[in-house]
Design a protein with these regions (language model features):
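Catalytic-pocket segment enriched in acidic/His residues
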Residues: 60, 64-204
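Active-site microenvironments in enzyme catalytic cores
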Residues: 1-107
């Protein structure tokens, strides 16, 4: 019943970085890594008065650049600015306290890597109520009509097992309690010296 310590959290991006299930997750040319992050997702909609309402939950792939993250802990925020995906199912009502799922990468139809993961409040460092409080206490996150997608974290990464994702690999994240798995291929943007060239800036 009391407010707990505030959690660490990072801004992922606006709605333009979300890709639909079965759609390719794009990796920018300047990226150092392309790593899945199998997570539970909470979806929230602010009403006309700015009051957040939890719509439900989904399976998510937060997707991050773990090489950039490890190079400098201050770059963790940078590493999160990547595409992501969630769905295809929406779980409404009470969330089971304990959830067991499987994260998998396939290559040319064969399983390259597979590992179980745990989620649900029984496996989280913070309660959902505490996470929600510390996010929506900021007025800018309570703008009427805004939709918020919260990725609640993971401890299971193929990167930790030295897996290097390649063009055309497919991520599959399953939580049986949610129904169908979330699946996305990965696509790398062209390396046409984009990473070495400064961004063109127009002058007003």
């Amino acid at each position: 019943g009391q407010v707990g310590a505030q959690p660490e959290w990072f801004y992922k991006g606006d709605g333009s970085i979300v890709v639909a299930p079965e759609t390719a997750i794009s990796v920018p040319a300047f990226a150092e890594d392309a790593g899945e992050e199998p997570e539970l997702v909470g979806l929230y909609l602010n009403d006309a008065n700015g009051q957040p309402h939890r719509i439900g939950y989904a399976v998510g792939n937060e997707f991050s650049d773990h090489i950039t993250e490890r190079a400098n802990y201050l770059w963790l925020a940078h590493s999160k600015l990547r595409a992501c995906s969630y769905g295809p199912e929406l779980l409404i009502g009470e969330l089971p306290q304990h959830l067991e799922g499987t994260s998998r990468i396939t290559r040319e139809g064969q399983t390259l890597w597979e590992k179980p993961f745990l989620t649900g409040e029984a496996n989280m460092a913070h309660s959902l109520a505490n996470l929600e409080h510390h996010h929506f206490k900021y007025a800018q996150f309570r703008a009427p009509g805004d939709l918020h997608v919260h990725f609640f974290g993971t401890a299971t990464l193929s990167f930790a097992d030295q897996i290097k994702v390649q063009e055309g690999d497919r991520f599959e994240i399953e939580l049986p309690a949610f129904g169908r798995a979330l699946r996305n291929p990965v696509a790398f943007e062209s390396h046409d010296n984009q990473a070495e060239q400064p961004s063109a800036m127009a002058v007003l």
